[in-house]
Amino acid sequence: MALNRLVFSLSLWLGFIGAAQAASSEPLPPSKDPWYTAPPGFESAEPGTVLRVRPAPGNLTSITANSSASYNILYRTTDSHFKPTWAVTTLLVPELGPDSLAQQKFQQSALLSFQVPYDSADVDASPSYSMYSASNDSSAPYTAALGSGLFVSVPDYEGPLAAFTAGIISGYATLDSIRAVLSLGLGLNITNSPRAALWGYSGGAFATEWASELAVQYAPDLVAGPVVGAAMGAPLANITTFMHSVNGQATSGLVPNTLLGLTSQYPDVRKYLVSKLNDDSEYNRTGFLAAEGFTVTESGVAFAGIDINKYFQNGTDILNDPKILALVNREGIMGYHGVPKWPLFIYQAIPDEVTPISATDALVEKYCAVGADILYERNTVGSHYEETNNSYKAAVQWLEDVFSSQHDINRAQGCVIQDVTRNTTSGDLVRRKDVQKSVFDLWSAAW
């Protein structure tokens, strides 16, 4: 094992030197960038081992507010079959120095793992590439965190097969991204009891929750050490109810993305799924499989308002097909792989039209019955998308508590479930066009 670590360390830094020389080149989509491959023999490395690192190509640092440097890190992780695979995370470094917020507030030792809801079965939609064209709305949380002195890791948690809604690999890849960053440093003070927290909304909360419940068995080192908590909004607790909720609605494009993402690691189930598609009709195989190359926005346009069952022979109810349900039960139902040991803040709008709150209620009830530490806030107003703004402040304040150890004082509180009313989208606190500035102000006020 020591020899393997030595070999990987040598190849890593040789690769880093070469990458640094080419850092000014434009980013390539992962499917066309040879850097997105693991070196020979990576399978023998331990989960979380760094396999490659490079300064992020192109202008990512300059276009990401409050960032002083950015790196791509390719690391060893584990797929849903419990076999070695790899994933990539992008590490964003805040402004550093003796007078920086990173030093004054956190001694350069605080890491936020931010899971972006990229919700796509296309590997080229992975954050390490899509961040170059991210809107202010989607980048606001992590750029604001950078502005408050946090290091930010943004993992491509779906892995190299873009396994959207595959909970096992999503959780493992998220956990191993934290391990990889903490082993590497790159400005992060890893000798001064570093603290890490996770945050995600919707698809990003899906990965955040799976990481939290899998950590007990997969990453006890993170449970016992640096991870201090996880915040998650509208976490897609049950993928079956989620797909039924969005099918035929404006967000119907999430269904093909889910079915293709779920089956990307299961060739037999993918073959079965494809065999059930129509050969020729308005809703045919070609149209459905086009989602493999779509971002979530593109799928939203292509499939808006369509009952996805129309793509299947005789209108088959594919969402209730036994083979599909068996896979969902393995990969898409939370609460069956372990009880999170670090504190959780879970928030969701009661009227959520994308993922029914009843599934989140059931998950929280299950965890609370076995002693989990959860603050669960159910917002009486707002849609799925409005809740991203409505509960920004609450999430930021809760993360401030766990980073500053204030939550540790009150850990005996156990589960707290409460209905709240937050309607910041009306303009009282956060207007959509001003979300970047407002979220930065929230982080700044917290610390």
Curated annotation (Swiss-Prot):
- Give the pathway annotation: Sesquiterpene biosynthesis; trichothecene biosynthesis
What keywords are annotated for this sequence in UniProt?
Glycoprotein, Hydrolase, Signal
Alphabetized InterPro entries for the sequence: AB_hydrolase_fold, Lipase_secreted
Protein induction: Expression is positively regulated by the trichothecene cluster-specific transcription activator TRI10.
Q: Which residues are glycosylated?
A: 59, 66, 136, 189, 238, 284, 314, 389, 423
Q: Where is the signal peptide?
A: 1-22
One example GO MF annotation: triacylglycerol lipase activity
Give an example GO biological process: lipid catabolic process
Could you name the active-site residues?
A: 202, 352, 384
The answer on whether this UniProt entry bears the keyword Glycoprotein reads: yes
Highest taxon of the source?
Answer: Eukaryota
Enzyme Commission code:
3.1.1.-
Q: Does the keyword Translocase apply?
A: no
Query: What does this gene product do?
Result: The biosynthesis of trichothecenes begins with the cyclization of farnesyl diphosphate to trichodiene and is catalyzed by the trichodiene synthase TRI5. Trichodiene undergoes a series of oxygenations catalyzed by the cytochrome P450 monooxygenase TRI4.
Q: Member of which family?
A: Belongs to the AB hydrolase superfamily. Lipase family.
Q: What else is known?
A: Trichothecenes are sesquiterpenoid toxins that act by inhibiting protein biosynthesis.
Name of protein = Trichothecene C-3 esterase
Q: Source species, please?
A: Fusarium sporotrichioides
